[in-house]
C-alpha cells in the first residue's frame, strides 16, 4: 500500500476511545506524494460520540419548571444521573469577582473531603470555571473540582461574562462524563432556583460557599442532541 490509512484510523480510534472512555468520531485529511510514495495524515478533530443507547425517551420540556432546581438550554453532556445528593454553590449576596481566588481555595478544600469519602456533588457558581483570569471566573484547576459530576456557570445580573461552555476542562468533562450547564436566569435563559438551596441547612458553610445535602438523590437528565439539561428533586 502507498499509505496505510486503515491502520492509522484504527489506531486513532483505539487511542481516542481509551482516553475519552467512549466511542469517538474523527475528522481528518491526508496529503499523498505519488512520487515519493508516502503521505501525511492530519487529525483535524476528535470528539466523543453521543451514546444512542442513552437516548432520552421523554421530552424534558414537559417537566414543570416549579419542580426544577437547574435548567440549561446550552449545555454539554448526555445521560441520566440519579445518585447525587450534594450541592456546593457560591453565595451570590455581596458576590464580587475580587474574591474568586479565595473561593477557589475554599472549593478545593471541600472537594478533598468528597474525594476522601468517594462521593460526588453538583457545583454551581458565576463566571467561567477554570479561567486563568480571576476577574472572569473562579480560577480552579481540574484537581480542585474533580469530584463534581455537574458543573454550572450561573450568570448574575451584576456579573455578566461570556460563557466558556466548558472549554477549560473539555477533555476532562468528556472523559469522565461530567455535565456542564450554562445558565443566565436573569435573562430568562434557563433556571437556577437558588432559593431552594438557601433554605436547606448547610452541611458546611464558609464565607463564600455553601454545601447542602438533599434527603433523596437529585435527578439529572441531559439531552446532548438538544443541549438541554435539567436537574430536579426526587418526588
State what each model feature region is:
Residues 1-25, 29:
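A long amphipathic alpha-helix within ATP-dependent nucleotide-binding catalytic cores
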Residues 3, 48-120, 125-126, 145-147, ...:
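C-terminal active-site "lid" helix and adjoining low-complexity regulatory extension at the edge
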Residues 22-48:
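Conserved metal-phosphate-binding beta-hairpin within the catalytic cores
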Residues 23, 53, 58, 153-180:
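Phosphate/diphosphate-binding loops
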Residues 28-37, 120-136:
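A glycine-rich phosphate-binding loop feature that marks nucleotide/adenosyl-phosphate handling sites
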Residues 35-43, 55-58, 133-138:
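Short acidic, glycine/serine/threonine-rich loops at helix termini
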Residues 141-151:
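Acidic, Ser/Thr-rich peripheral helices and adjacent loops at domain boundaries
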Residues 232-235:
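Conserved small/polar residues in nucleotide/adenosyl-binding loops
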